[in-house]
């Protein structure tokens, strides 16, 4: 791992044969805690991270930086394991993403916890 721990996603076919694996790595700790797959095979994960983390498992990078505490992440990979997007949410204390679901329209829902104040829409300046 790059930091104290990295997160991974692996895909196997219905017969247990390996298809692909991807990792999220960073300067400190990344914990992948929940996964969901939509009807198109896109893969969504949530969990927590500290420090800086690269959520693009390909050749490019998408570096997210925590606010100094443990922050929430939500990410999306397509059915082939290619990066689509990743978001982070932070607050004044520790926070963690504990669940992720996708509805039939492709809307993504997350649940978790936070301490202190929390910014649910970091792009809303």
Tell me the role of every PLM-derived stretch.
Residues 1-125:
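A sequence-level/structural motif corresponding to short, flexible coil/turn segments enriched
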